[in-house]
C-alpha cells in the first residue's frame, strides 16, 4: 500500500532541491527557527531573511511545552513563542504566508500531541499551507502508519532522525520509512551549539550512505562555518538551529540587528556549502 501511494506522487520540492544541489555539486543549508519567537511578525521576517540569504529548505519549529529533544536555547525559544499563544492553525498560516513570499521547501518540526489532536485535519491543513515535510520528534516509524498515510496521500514526507546510538537493524527500519532526506543527529543528547563535534560523525554518515540513497543532513551542534564546511564533506545538508536562535536571544530588543546578524550568518554558511 505504501508503495502504491509513493507512485502517485514524485514531485515533492525537497527531492527537487537535493537533485538541483547535486547537479551543482553543492550542499543544502537548512536553518531552524521557532514560529512565534520572539513574536509572530519578527519570526516571519526572520524566515524571510533566511529564504533570501541562502536557505535551501527551512525547518520551522512548532512551540511545544515539553521539548524533550531540545537544549536550553531552543527550550527558551519555545517558551518565548508559547507566550504568544501560537496554535497549529497559526503555524500553518505562517507557512502559507511564507510560501507567497518565496516558495522555499518547509519542514515542520513538531511533537506528536499537537498533530494527534487534529488527526487528518492536520494533513489537510499542512497540504493547503504548502508543507513539504513533517518531522515528528517523538513518533517512531513503527507507530506512524496512520500518520504517514494521511501525509503521504498529500505528497508530504515524514522526516526521520537517526542518532549515533542507532544500531544497524534500527537504522534499516527507520530508513525503510524515510523520504526526502534523513536527519542525522551528530551528538547524543539534546540540541545546542557546540565548539567541537565528535570525530565519529563522518564515519557514521558514511555508514548510513551505504544503506540508503537518500540525502543525509547533519544537525545538532553545528555553530560555525568551519564546522559546516567540514561536515559538508561527508553529508548532503547542514542543519543549524541553536546558533541562529542565539542571535534572537542576544538581540531580543533590536529586531533590525537580529535580521542583520542572521542574514550575515546565513550568507557565511551558504558560502562554504
Feature roles, as predicted:
Residues 57-66, 133-135, 140-143, 184-193, ...:
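Glycine-rich phosphate-binding active-site loops on the catalytic face of alpha/beta enzymes
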Residues 29-33, 58-60, 106-110, 134-136, ...:
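Hydrophobic faces of well-ordered beta-strands that scaffold small-molecule active sites
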Residues 2-103, 120, 257-261, 267:
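Conserved N-terminal beta1-alpha1 strand-loop-helix module at the mouth
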Residues 206-212, 223-229, 233-273:
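Alpha/beta catalytic cores of nucleotide-metabolism and tRNA/nucleoside-modifying enzymes
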Residues 9-21, 66-74, 86-94, 115-119, ...:
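Active-site-adjacent beta->alpha loops and helix N-cap segments on the catalytic face
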Residues 31, 50, 61, 126, ...:
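Conserved, mostly hydrophobic/aromatic
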Residues 71-107, 150-159, 163, 200-216, ...:
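Alpha-helix-loop-beta-strand connector modules within alpha/beta enzyme cores
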Residues 41-49, 166-176, 218, 222-238:
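Catalytic cores of alpha/beta
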Amino acid at each position: 500500500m505504501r508503495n502504491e501511494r509513493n507512485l502517485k506522487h514524485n514531485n515533492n520540492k525537497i527531492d527537487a532541491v537535493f537533485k538541483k544541489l547535486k547537479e551543482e555539486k553543492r550542499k543544502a543549508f537548512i536553518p531552524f527557527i521557532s514560529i512565534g519567537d520572539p513574536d509572530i511578525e519578527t519570526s516571519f521576517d526572520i524566515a524571510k531573511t533566511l529564504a533570501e540569504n541562502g536557505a535551501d529548505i527551512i525547518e520551522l519549529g512548532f512551540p511545544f511545552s515539553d521539548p524533550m529533544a531540545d537544549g536550553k536555547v531552543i527550550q527558551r525559544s519555545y517558551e518565548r513563542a508559547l507566550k504568544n499563544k501560537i496554535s497549529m492553525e497559526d503555524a500553518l498560516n505562517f507557512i502559507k504566508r511564507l510560501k507567497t513570499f518565496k516558495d522555499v521547501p518547509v519542514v515542520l518540526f513538531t511533537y506528536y500531541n499537537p498533530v494527534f489532536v487534529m488527526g487528518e485535519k492536520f494533513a489537510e491543513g499542512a497540504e493547503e499551507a504548502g508543507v513539504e515535510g513533517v518531522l515528528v520528534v517523538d513518533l517512531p516509524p513503527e507507530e506512524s502508519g496512520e500518520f504517514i498515510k494521511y501525509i503521504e496521500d498529500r505528497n508530504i514526507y515524514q522526516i526521520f532522525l537517526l542518532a549515533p546510538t542507532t544500531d544497524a537493524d534500527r537504522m534499516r527500519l527507520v530508513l525503510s520509512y524515510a523520504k526526502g532526506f534523513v536527519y542525522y543527529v551528530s551528538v547524543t543528547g539534546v540540541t545546542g551549539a557546540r565548539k567541537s563535534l565528535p570525530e565519529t560523525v563522518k564515519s557514521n554518515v558514511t555508514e548510513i550512505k551505504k544503506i540508503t540513497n537518500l540525502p543525509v543532513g547533519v544537525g545538532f551542534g553545528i555553530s560555525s562555518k568551519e564546522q559546516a564546511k567540514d561536515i559538508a564533506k561527508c553529508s548532503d545538508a547542514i542543519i543549524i538551529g541553536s546558533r541562529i536562535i542565539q542571535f534572537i536571544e542576544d538581540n531580543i530588543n533590536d529586531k533590525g540587528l537580529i535580521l542583520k546578524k542572521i542574514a550575515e550568518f546565513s550568507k557565511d554558511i551558504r558560502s562554504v556549502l
